[in-house]
From Swiss-Prot:
Major localization class: cytoplasm
Record's keyword annotation contains Cytoplasm: yes
A GO cellular-component term linked to this record: cytoplasm
GO molecular function annotation: rRNA N-glycosylase activity; toxin activity
Coiled-coil regions listed: none
Name the record gives this protein: Ribosome-inactivating protein 3
Name of the gene this protein is made from: CRIP3
Catalytic reaction list: Endohydrolysis of the N-glycosidic bond at one specific adenosine on the 28S rRNA
Length: 300
């Protein structure tokens, strides 16, 4: 998506501002008695408190998007041995960064970008669009589940530098079945392992909040030893969340409108959209957003 250009006043305000989340939800990742669905339902419930109803739209509508985010939520993902905290914008449910147990914030972006997080965050060194995280691969290639989330949390919690840790992790994982793929990925991109872990969390948490279909699919296979993946169609829908939200506003004014790009996604009307999407992005502001953790790739 298009990146924003912040005014000097915006930059100063963000630099001096300490983020205070509206709420923090804790998810004990390895607790088999705590369903993924319960975690997502709890976070959605708190997000909806900050949403509005819009005439003609079935789903709750998120707060208006701001150049400098005003509303945040945190989710703390805890394993038996470690934890990380995800910082998510309330106005668009984009993951902006994560905090390690040592208190270090890692933020999507690179030198020269504008920090959105406080507490002296460090740049991850790459952006947060799906194109940045998985290249041209489809989201159906992302394997998720309780075990995948556990590994992601444990690995990301140990992050200390931009590249050296990823190289160490790849060496440690060379005995795994996918060792050849990991080695090839590391040779091409030293941060490939970090990107792989982050995209799993983005889909399971952020897209799980946005999409009914995603949360149901992930929940159904969350405890599977083999993990769970989205369908090709679900993956394409996820990457068009912004466009689906725009369509929801169009259908609010013109209920019988035929929207070709929605038909290509298997969404014929607002009833079908409501079955698929749980939370709609507010379209009443023309504000463009910064590239953050799970931007739609519509405008890439």
């Amino acid at each position: 998506m298009a990146e924003i250009t912040l005014e000097p006043s915006d930059l100063m305000a963000q630099t001096n501002k300490r983020i205070v989340p509206k709420f923090t939800e804790i998810f004990p990742v390895e607790d088999a008695n705590y369903p993924y669905s319960a975690f997502i339902a709890s976070v959605r419930k708190d997000v909806i408190k900050h949403c509005t109803d819009h005439k003609g739209i079935f789903q709750p509508v998120l707060p208006p998007e701001k150049k400098v985010p005003e509303l945040w939520l945190y989710t703390e993902l805890k394993t038996r041995t470690s934890s990380i905290t995800l910082a998510i914008r309330m106005d668009n449910l984009y993951l902006v960064g994560f905090r390690t147990p040592g208190g270090v914030w890692w933020e999507f972006g690179k030198d020269g970008d504008t920090h959105l997080l406080g507490d002296n965050p460090r740049w991850l060194g790459f952006g947060g669009r799906y194109q940045d995280l998985i290249g041209n691969k489809g989201l159906e290639t992302v394997t998720m589940g309780r075990a995948e989330m556990t590994r992601a949390v444990n690995d990301l919690a140990k992050k200390k530098k931009m590249a050296t840790l990823e190289e160490e992790e790849v060496q440690m994982q060379m005995q795994m079945p996918e060792a050849a793929d990991l080695a090839a990925a590391a040779a091409a991109d030293p941060q490939a392992d970090t990107k792989s872990k982050l995209v799993k969390l983005v889909v399971m948490v952020c897209e799980g909040l946005r999409f009914n279909t995603v949360s149901r699919t992930v929940d159904a296979g969350f405890n599977s030893q083999h993990g769970v993946t989205l369908t090709v169609t679900q993956g394409k829908q996820v990457q068009k969340w912004d466009r689906i939200s725009k369509a929801a506003f169009e259908w609010a004014d013109h209920p019988t409108a035929v929207i070709p790009d929605m038909q290509k996604l298997g969404i014929k009307d607002k009833n079908e959209a409501a079955r698929i999407v749980a939370l709609v992005k507010n379209q009443t502001t023309a504000c463009a957003t910064a590239a953050s953790a799970d931007n739609d790739d519509d405008e890439a």
